[in-house]
Amino acid sequence: MTDRKSTGGALDRRTTLKLGAAGLGAAAFGFPAIVRAQTDAIRIGHLTPMTGFLGALGGYAVLGIKMAEEEINQAGGVMGRPIQVISEDSINPDTAATKAQRMLDRDGAAFLMGEISSASALAISQVAARNKRLFLSIGARSDTLRGKSCNKYMFCVDIPNTVMVNAVGSALLRDNMVKGKRFVTLTADYVFGHDLLRAAKAFFAAHGGNLVGDELVATDVTDFSPYLLKIRQARPDVVCSNLAGNQVTNLIKQYAEFGLPYPIVGFNLNTADAWAAGEGNLSGTWPTVWYHTLDTPGSKAFVEKFVKKNGKPPENHAWIQYISLKLMAEAMNAAKSTDSETLGAYLEKGTQFDILKARKAYFRAWDHQLIQEAYPFTVKPKAQIKDKWDMLQLGAAVPNPDQPLESIYPTREQNPCSL
């Protein structure tokens, strides 16, 4: 396909020669001296946006999963076999579905991983279900994926929208910024944003906040001046962003240029988008699943290796792709299988995985959500910022150490998932 952007895939003559050379080098990593046929590698289909409004996040995703792939192979692979991650640009839901099917049919992928776009993740999950192959949805956050659109073959790693709202909401409640306050929201006009708005409305209603206006924003919008003029007219107490990808970056830059006096917070932010906004532009409280200053031994070691390899700190999508491939390698070794039914049953057992945080994580059997800590963060004063990567101050993990991890996740009563 002419639109294909890939770091693995079709076995043309040049690729075959390269793979043959890689097989010869495998002996140095602990594999038998006899050169293995490429079909003996465990092939994993990996889809993520590498272009478009989520492209910057996808770039970090590829760096993270490739780093994990290298480490796993250097340690002997999985069940004595090398793994090969085939990464491609998902582009949009239709293309993502087509490529997912091709990875299974032509490339011989054992299962599928990846994605950041909730819309594309939904499309891939449908391919996975039809083919009865496991899909590890790594970076998509829509509650819908874990709710009414859940299926037996999809497992979700990233924190869902409800958890992001709860993470930021706990900080807003602490600072008396909800009850009786008037909110205006800007929402990404696709499944993720619509889903996030529902979670935000539920939070406002439960805690006495008043939503006085919302604007749906197309994912290709770059000029936010019409929306900022409406905010100026509405004169809210708080502005809340339900945007995604470079939408957030563009909003933050233009919000600072307009000089609006209303505090801005957000229920979704990825750190690459925060970094791109530039020093002095971002403000308020935002949620994250991980940040490179997290003070745990495992996280610090990962950051050190990533910086040494790439010359910059890892963004949260690099971290989450890295730990996702590591936990799948652990699952395959423990289950002694690459079969999707076997792996799914293993993940449903509640096995705890080290994801480089203070508390270990596990998949919940009834909705396939990885249960883990989340964090709010705020923006450092400009005088305290050391470099462009040092803008954010990570808050305390939620839930508190003495609370169950599931306390910030939707309950069975709140979640319509039926596997």
Task: Indicate residue ranges for each PLM-predicted region.
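Extracytosolic ligand-binding ectodomains
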Residues: 2-7, 11-21, 29-419
